[in-house]
Swiss-Prot record:
Cross-referenced SUPFAM superfamilies: SAICAR synthase-like (SSF56104)
GO biological process per UniProt: 'de novo' IMP biosynthetic process; cobalamin biosynthetic process
Keyword list, A-Z: ATP-binding, Ligase, Nucleotide-binding, Purine biosynthesis
MF GO annotations: ATP binding; phosphoribosylaminoimidazolesuccinocarboxamide synthase activity
Chain's gene name: purC
Pathway: Purine metabolism; IMP biosynthesis via de novo pathway; 5-amino-1-(5-phospho-D-ribosyl)imidazole-4-carboxamide from 5-amino-1-(5-phospho-D-ribosyl)imidazole-4-carboxylate: step 1/2
Family from the record: Belongs to the SAICAR synthetase family.
UniProt lineage: Bacteria, Bacillati, Bacillota, Clostridia, Lachnospirales
EC number: 6.3.2.6
Species: Lachnoclostridium phytofermentans (strain ATCC 700394 / DSM 18823 / ISDg)
Thylakoid in keyword set: no
Reactions performed catalytically: 5-amino-1-(5-phospho-D-ribosyl)imidazole-4-carboxylate + L-aspartate + ATP = (2S)-2-[5-amino-1-(5-phospho-beta-D-ribosyl)imidazole-4-carboxamido]succinate + ADP + phosphate + 2 H(+)
Class in the EC hierarchy, top level: ligase
Family annotation (PROSITE patterns): SAICAR_SYNTHETASE_1 (PS01057), SAICAR_SYNTHETASE_2 (PS01058)
Annotated protein name in UniProt: Phosphoribosylaminoimidazole-succinocarboxamide synthase
Amino acid sequence: MKKLEQLYEGKAKKVYKTDVEDVLIVDYKDDATAFNGEKRGTIVGKGVINNRMSNYIMKQLEKEGVPTHYIEELSDRETAVKKVQIVPLEVIIRNVSAGSFAKKLGIEEGRKLLCPTLEFSYKDDSLGDPMINSSYAKALGLATQEEIDTISTYAYKVNEVMIKYFEGIGIELIDFKIEFGRYHDQIILADEISPDTCRLWDIKTHEKLDKDRFRRDLGNVEDAYLEVFKRLGIE
């Protein structure tokens, strides 16, 4: 497989065309952003950790029946993925009160929720990725009811699998954001799963091991990402 021209560069990744139909190459960067790009910086080694961690988790999810865009890890930073049409919805699952959820509802951070919550946000940085419901998504033509049902089912399954997996390495899955795409009329998990897209706390100390360390200027960002990577035991 040959890497061809760059198709897109986002906040955390570059995407390249290949000489294979319906296959792209994703190149993970060390760039870090927060608050819809208002805060910018660099987390040394983040690209390697996010690439390898995301691939590792997606392979586990495939075993549990969640289809993903993952094809093959090409290098520490590059992965071959299926070319999908991204559904313009960010899907957020929350298990514990944190971040904007806690602030918006006036709930203390760290409060265990009685059940996981599912949110949709409209993917548009210029609007601040506003929260919408399934009726909005259908009315705007972002997704059909069948697609929304499939996305919701997969999102809860991802949560179920990851909660157990992270608990096994002493990490609590607070919340996470995922994205889905259309691939030959099938809905599959796309984008990434990493400390950029998940809130991960040490179960015993509640130390934050995710991008909140960058957002909130807590320091030791690289160490936190590396700690998650090491606990996963990725070789």
